[in-house]
């Protein structure tokens, strides 16, 4: 594994990637942002990531399918699910199927940074949460 934690961030809402990509880069993650789950899946087939952050509900493919693919092909990868408040039961189901953690929308970038730091520690890596600097 390189020094930087490799993160794939998938959410069909453009603002999520726009805000969270730079927030994660500040703590030492190398982030690839996707809005299209099909494109994200194609990338996952070519590259292994340390952490995958995915929305559960998307149009073409849902986050549960991404979770299942990652679990089958890269069991070391930690998957963090993003969900709306109305989908907490679905997030719990994702945890039962092997997701590392989940975050309910709306959330702050610091909330995701904390979960990323926890996932990095579980992988034996680290990110510098304190270098995040100013809140977003």
Please provide the spans of the model-predicted regions.
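Acidic catalytic/metal-coordinating carboxylates
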Residues: 35-36, 62-65, 83
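The short loop immediately C-terminal to the conserved phospho-acceptor aspartate in CheY-like receiver
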Residues: 52, 56-57, 78
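Short amphipathic alpha-helix used as the core "switch/output" element in two-component signaling
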Residues: 42, 64-76, 93
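Short hydrophobic/Thr-rich beta-strand motif most characteristic of the beta2 strand and flanking loop
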Residues: 28-35, 43
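The feature encodes the CheY-like receiver
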Residues: 17, 59, 87
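Conserved acidic segment of CheY-like receiver
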Residues: 4-15, 20-24, 52
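C-terminal output helix
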Residues: 89, 107-117
């Amino acid at each position: 594994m390189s020094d930087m934690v490799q993160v794939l961030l998938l959410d069909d809402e453009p603002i999520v990637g726009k805000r969270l990509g730079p927030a994660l880069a500040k703590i030492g993650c190398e982030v690839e942002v996707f809005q299209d789950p099909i494109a994200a899946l194609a990338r996952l087939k070519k590259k292994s990531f340390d952490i995958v952050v995915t929305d559960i509900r998307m149009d073409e493919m849902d986050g549960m399918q991404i979770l299942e693919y990652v679990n089958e092909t890269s069991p070391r990868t930690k998957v963090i699910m993003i969900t709306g408040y109305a989908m907490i039961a679905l997030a719990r189901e994702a945890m039962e199927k092997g997701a590392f953690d989940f975050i309910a929308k709306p959330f702050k970038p610091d909330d995701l940074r904390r979960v990323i730091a926890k996932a990095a520690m579980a992988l034996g890596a680290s990110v510098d949460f304190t270098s995040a600097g100013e809140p977003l």
